[in-house]
A protein has these predicted regions:
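Karyopherin-beta/Importin-beta family HEAT-repeat alpha-solenoid scaffold
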Residues: 1-270
């Protein structure tokens, strides 16, 4: 911990990075004791957060710090909740850093994904965190960024929904990206999981707003005889049907008939 703190003349960024990597390695061992680490938790989080915001340029350096924070979040679990707001507040400035080659942003997406997984379920005011996530996702799904950030962004989207008890407008609006993501085999399975979590939170609302476009995009996945992802949309459809009220099942059936989805499902059984 002494090496992790900023102390001019005693430590520098190189020493602090080595200390951060050592701390992550210690926290990741089976002998790590959560309660024994409790007296050092605040100092560790403050030091790592300060180092992360200190203008590190190398992606490996940023990754070392975010990895250390992720490991600590995993190991101390709910003890990390009080530090959630401060960690979330530093994300926008870091995300806005000049990063034309997208070398820093993957580490930030992984970090925020772990943050929402550990922090979001324990707060009532989830909308602000969801809005931050939506901003990161929208940027990540831009055509120039998607090949490098798309997979990590979808994981962040999934973890955010799985950790939420309600949908805010920014996350709902993101569903406009779903048909295009479903059309790409590398993203389709994760997008189906995202849809599953979404329909659990707001089954009727998303059915009426996005059902036609999303299920229209899923139909080719189900109907293609050699589709490698046929089960993912089937699971998503099943989840939605189970989540809907009886009164809304007719609307679901109409959408399945209006798209080729019902025919595709029957054809896949033959």
């Amino acid at each position: 911990m002494q090496l992790l703190r900023q102390a001019p003349g005693y430590t520098d960024a190189t020493i602090q990075l080595l200390a951060a990597r050592s701390l992550a390695a210690i926290a990741d061992t089976i002998t790590f004791e959560r309660h024994a680490f409790q007296p050092y938790l605040q100092d560790a989080v403050v030091a790592l957060a300060h180092l992360l915001q200190s203008g590190l340029e190398e992606p490996d350096s940023v990754r070392s710090i975010t990895h250390a924070l992720c490991v600590i979040m995993d190991r101390v679990d709910t003890d990390m909740v009080p530090y959630g707001p401060a960690l979330a507040d530093m994300v926008p400035k870091m995300w806005a850093r000049d990063d034309p080659q997208m070398r820093l942003k993957p580490s930030l997406l992984e970090f925020v994904s772990k943050l929402v997984e550990k922090y979001l379920p324990h707060i009532e005011a989830q909308a602000q965190m969801q809005a931050l996530v939506a901003r990161l996702l929208r940027d990540s799904f831009e055509p120039a960024a998607r090949p490098l950030l798309g997979h990590d962004a979808l994981l962040l989207w999934y973890h955010t929904l799985a950790s939420s008890y309600a949908l805010s407008a920014p996350l709902v609006e993101l569903l406009s990206c779903a048909p295009e993501l479903l059309a790409q085999p590398e993203y389709a399975p994760l997008m189906c999981r995202v849809w599953e979590e979404t329909v659990l939170l707001a089954p009727e609302d998303v059915l009426h707003a996005f059902g036609m476009s999303v299920y229209g995009a899923m139909a080719p996945m189900v109907g293609h005889p050699n589709s490698p992802v046929i089960m993912e949309p089937i699971f998503a459809i099943d989840m939605h049907v189970r989540a809907l009220s009886t009164a809304s099942l007719g609307a679901m059936a109409n959408i399945m008939r209006a798209t080729p989805l019902d025919e595709a499902i029957f054809a896949s059984l033959c």
